[in-house]
Amino acid sequence: MTETASGPARGSRAKGTKAKGLRIERIHTTPGVHPYDEVEWARRDVVMTNWRDGSVNFEQRGVEFPDFWSVNAVNIVTSKYFRGAVGTPQREVSLRQLIDRIVKTYRKAGEDYKYFASPADAEIFEHELAYALLHQIFSFNSPVWFNVGTPQPQQVSACFILAVDDSMESILDWYKEEGMIFKGGSGAGLNLSRIRSSKELLSSGGNASGPVSFMRGADASAGTIKSGGATRRAAKMVILDVDHPDIEDFIETKVKEEEKIRALRDAGFDMDLGGDDITSVQYQNANNSVRVNDTFMKAVEEGGKFGLTSRMTGEVIEEVDAKSLFRKMAEAAWACADPGIQYDDTINHWHTCPESGRINGSNPCSEYMHLDNTSCNLASLNLMKFLKDDGKGRQSFEVERFAKVVELVITAMDISICFADFPTQKIGENTRAFRQLGIGYANLGALLMATGHAYDSDGGRALAGAITSLMTGTSYKRSAELAAVVGPYDGYARNAQPHQRVMKQHSDANGVAVRVDDLDTPIWAAATEAWQDVLHLGEKNGFRNAQASVIAPTGTIGLAMSCDTTGLEPDLALVKFKKLVGGGSMQIVNGTVPQALRRLGYQEEQIEAIVAHIAENGNVIDAPGLKHEHYEVFDCAMGERSISAMGHVRMMAAIQPWISGALSKTVNLPETATVEDVEEVYFEAWKMGVKALAIYRDNCKVGQPLSAKKKETEKAEVTAKTEATIREAVEKVVEYRPVRKRLPKGRPGITTSFTVGGAEGYMTANSYPDDGLGEVFLKMSKQGSTLAGMMDAFSIAVSVGLQYGVPLETYVSKFTNMRFEPAGMTDDPDVRMAQSIVDYIFRRLALDFLPFETRSALGIHSAEERQRHLETGSYEPSDDVDMDVEGLAQSAPRAQELKAVATPKAEVAAAVPAPKQAHTSAELVEMQLGIQADAPLCFSCGTKMQRAGSCYICEGCGSTSGCS
């Protein structure tokens, strides 16, 4: 591990004296070799389009990245983090420039503020930091990439907590401060409970407005600002204590707005998120949370009364039924996903600095919780980078390397506070005084699956808890070592006793944690040692940081690290999209799936079969050879085997005891969930010691896409009404005419020579490029004969019928088995006997253009299928048979797909939607499940976003609604 310059002698140092500096140990780098020289670099073109209209919304060609970086990561880092105007000499064109801009700034600040024992240690620090960023081992939060090393203010914090008092001056300052934070690329939250309620009087004698009314102004301000100027939307949180007299109005704010959205949508307005008309609705730019205390929750449990208190006097001015109020919270969350819930007593029980004030608020995603007017800078580790896998099922977690990287990152994060700029003087003073950090991780869901652990299992929770305990224990250990070198945080002296108490709570929780298997046991052992060091070094040196860890959504930075999963989320699905370097994309089965199967003891042949099944079906149900007890390992956030709501809550509870702050997490519920289900989640999370959470019931928001089932139902209702109206109004003037679909000038075709009963001929079958058979030409050997003439006429009639929509299977069923001469033997191995030329022609067309199920029902099989029937008793092809012909050319429209076309004399046009194409993994899941994920479209590129903690992240371009 990293040591101080005084080495072993530091134990004899007089208390209060400082060590000379940190000795930085190499983790990954080689002396005399720069990390950039150890990788292969490649030039890439980044062209990002808006899927809605095809327009190019970002383009930069010839950027330089390591060749192992994914296309998606290159696109996101280039478009989000490269600085300078595109096309100017100031624009960054290489990842080297970006990383150098950051690590050199950190090194210089570390030297200026006396962190390192020598220039050699400073150089090792720079190289190790560069290596870790280059190899996507960790990432700072987005503001670091946006701002550090640029001429603009060096804002490094992603998370801010503001404060507002019961005065107009303070309220207007709140609006201004939020705007400045959004401008710097970050998010902010605050508690409004100090503002007097609408049930209390002003000094002038009138009634107060109440906090809900002032939320309107802040919401409107946030809606006009893009975070970071151009790359992110504003993210904000508003909180109200459960004992505030206006709590019911607060709970119902978004429910009432959702009702407005429904009415406006039904009236024809564009109410999708990002739509032109959604901005007319209030309270859409913030997450709302109710701060509940143990007194309230116990009253809910016991069915008692609960008092709402005056903001001015603290007296109870109204009593309410606690269970009814709790029910209203659950009903509102069920209806529109707000409000979330925060557990005040749990939060403050783990507070390291209670002598300096209570924890009242949180950042927008609810993972940072500390004093008012403070900030936290985040960094997240890519957990999959620490999984050692020999490819044969033997795995281990690299405990020592993980701890060393944590020490490196904590050191860098603390250095950044020294040179950072802050949006307000109060936030700057408080952050420098308490130096809150938020180290966390991403890819937990991928790690659990890769190691054969179900997300909702004792083994999965044990592994997640062990890693979290080691991370936070190592972070506080490094914080104590930093305190020995550059001193503890300014507020430590006043809060030394409660800080030590919280460290003891973390250590005690580690001591009673359950060890499950060979993966988590050595991690727990290392964590135990780390916490022992924390208690010893902290008592001697104090701590450099009031907080050390959070679990953030890791939206943009998770994609920049090519993570499969964000924060502590499980995997979205087993099949995802991978962008290709040359353009385009392909569907792939998660690489964690074969890793998990090897860990579970499956052989390579079995793994190939299971992966092939997943590729085809999107899930593991009925996968060949997969044991039923292993199904749970592959459970995901969406799909037929999705993780239950309480499975998410149990994972949060397994991690929370070793996190300084909280966890950004939304518990997803199915559309069929009840209000009682929401109540259960909120109540059990309190019992389990979770600090905060939010729920999201699929399709609860009108401003987001409905499920396919709902859309079809509504469309059917509208269509039925419309058709009835049309029939009544234009019945006498409607003419029913078929519509001909002509083939293009160039069309694919198959020419087949044949002999039937000695008569020779040729058949050319041409098809639409994407929609099956469109015409047939028949030529018999003797030109001018009656037979040849009849075949010409017959082929024209059939071709015209196909183009007017007559299904091919209708022709096949009518003309096969028709008897006339010539008949007899053929030279076609698939059709050995034909009762006529027409019989042969349509049997051949069926084999070439109809799917197996359709022609099998007509009794038409190939020679290979007949042989299979003799051997196995079944005509059906096995899973590994390549169905080239059927995949290439499907038949003309089948009978069940054929619909009457009414063409009124008045011009009536029906839009025919193009086949849906998926552009992201979220959209791919929708296509596989036949439902739509309830998530907004990205405001930058138009693709479907996906959940990341309590925020949304766009897999296509990296835009996020959160703050990481």
Curated annotation (Swiss-Prot):
Looking up InterPro entries in the UniProt record yields: RdRp_reductase_class-2, RNR_2_N, RNR_lg_C, RNR_NrdJ/NrdZ, TSCPD_dom
Cofactor(s) the protein needs: adenosylcob(III)alamin
Q: Which UniProt keywords apply?
A: Cobalamin, Cobalt, Disulfide bond, DNA synthesis, Nucleotide-binding, Oxidoreductase
Per the Swiss-Prot or TrEMBL record, the active site comprises N363, C365, E367
Q: How is the cofactor bound?
A: 5'-deoxyadenosylcobalamine (coenzyme B12).
Q: List the disulfide bonds.
A: C159-C376
Per its UniProt entry, which superkingdom is the organism in?
Answer: Bacteria
Q: From the Swiss-Prot or TrEMBL record, what is one GO molecular function term?
A: nucleotide binding
- EC main group: oxidoreductase
In this chain, composition skew of type Basic residues spans 12-21
Offer one example of a GO biological process linked to this entry. Answer: DNA biosynthetic process
- What Pfam families does the record point to? Ribonuc_red_2_N (PF08471), Ribonuc_red_lgC (PF02867), TSCPD (PF12637)
Q: For binding substrate, which residues are annotated in this chain's numbering? A: S142, A158, C159, G187, N363, P364, C365, S366, E367, P553, T554, G555, T556, I557
* CDD domains per record: RNR_II_dimer
Quote the catalytic activity from the record.
a 2'-deoxyribonucleoside 5'-diphosphate + [thioredoxin]-disulfide + H2O = a ribonucleoside 5'-diphosphate + [thioredoxin]-dithiol
Chain segments carrying region Disordered: 1-21
According to its UniProt record, the EC number is 1.17.4.1
Entries under PANTHER family matching the protein: RIBONUCLEOSIDE-DIPHOSPHATE REDUCTASE (PTHR43371:SF1), VITAMIN B12-DEPENDENT RIBONUCLEOTIDE REDUCTASE (PTHR43371)
- Report the function annotation for this chain: Catalyzes the reduction of ribonucleotides to deoxyribonucleotides. May function to provide a pool of deoxyribonucleotide precursors for DNA repair during oxygen limitation and/or for immediate growth after restoration of oxygen.
Give the family from UniProt.
Answer: Belongs to the ribonucleoside diphosphate reductase class-2 family.
Q: What is this protein called?
A: Vitamin B12-dependent ribonucleotide reductase
Native organism is Streptomyces avermitilis (strain ATCC 31267 / DSM 46492 / JCM 5070 / NBRC 14893 / NCIMB 12804 / NRRL 8165 / MA-4680)
